[in-house]
Amino acid sequence: METVQPGSEKEREAIDRFKSFYQVFSAEIIKDRIRTVYAGPAYFRDGYREVTGLDNIEAYFLKSAETVHECTFDIQDVAVHEGNYYFRWVMNLTTKRWKDEPITAVGMSHVRFDQEGKVIFHQDYWDTSLVYEKIPIVGSVIRWVREQF
């Protein structure tokens, strides 16, 4: 698969577009911009789900946004190596159910862009147990396990 040309204007625009898309995670932004960021056959995976295809990614993001009160990503830096882009970020999240209990998580997105500068591969790495801890019984178990080590 051909990827965006390193050092090109398209590469810079792809990076900027990705960073801008994730500044605020909301249904409005997803609906308005996802098709400018992700390619049709894109692959996405995070700690909750693995999704292939732009329509499926959009549906997953919109479903996720339904539970969010506010979610922002502060992208700290970007590393590039042989067509792979690594975005290191801090997510600040409050859910509709737990508005008074903000979650801050450090994570990283491994991304590849196609030749048009759209995301074709996106794998997120972060500690999803920070969200699971909020669920009454599951949270108790996770906290207990953490205390054991």
Task: State where each predicted segment sits.
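Short, low-complexity N-terminal intrinsically disordered segments enriched in polar/charged residues
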Residues: 1-32, 36, 148-149
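A beta-strand edge to alpha-helix "cap/lid" segment located at domain peripheries
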Residues: 1-6, 66-72, 79-149
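A structural signal for well-ordered alpha-helical scaffolds and beta->alpha junctions
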Residues: 15-18, 54, 104
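General structural signal for alpha-helix termini and helix-helix connectors
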Residues: 24, 43-44, 96
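A solvent-exposed, acidic/Ser-Thr-rich amphipathic alpha-helical stretch
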Residues: 12, 31-83
